[in-house]
C-alpha cells in the first residue's frame, strides 16, 4: 500500500521558503525516525519516499506533499506527520496548520483505476523541478521514452510484486505515446553544491494504444502523483499531478 500526505505550512511573515527547502524537510524527517528505519532507508538504492514542496495558488498555501511508497515506511512515517505541529528548521520554524491524509491505495486499485478510462489524452503538470539522466547528462525535456522509463522504474520499486518487465509490451507502449502539447520553462534546482538543470510546467500526452496497453499506461499515470517523475524524487524533485481525460488520479 502507498499513501500521500499533504502538510500545509505557514512560514513566518517575510520568510521566503524556496522549493529546494524540500531537501531540508527531508533531513528533518529522517532525524525523527528510529535509527534502524533511517539506516534502512539510506541503504536502499530507490528510497520509498517521494516528496516535494510547492505553493498552491488555488489554496494560497505552501504545501509539502509526502508520498510513502511501501507499507513499512507508511507505518513509520504516517503517524509522525499526522501529529506534527511545527517543523523546527534551523533557518525558521515552520508551523503546520493542516494535514491532509489520502486513503492508502494498492497496485491493484491503481490498475483498476486505469481500466476505468477509455480516454487517450492526459496532462502531466510538474509542480517541482523535474529532470532526467540520459547517457550521463541531464535531459531537460520530457520525451516520451524518458517519461515511460521513469514511471516504470518508480512503479517497479514501489510494487515489485506487480513489476512491469515485458520488454515487448513496454516498447509497444512507448511507440504509442506522443507529446502533443507542452508549456515548459527551464529552471535550476539547487542541491548541496550543484544546481541541477531541470524544467517545470506541463505536457499533454496522447496514447494511441490497444486497450490492454492503454489500461497499463493509465495505471502508470495514476501512480505518477505518488512516485513522481524523473530523478531525485526523494530530494524534492519531480513532483507531479496528472489528469486523465477530465478526471484526476485517485
Language-model segments: what does each one mean?
Residues 1-250:
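RNA-interacting cores
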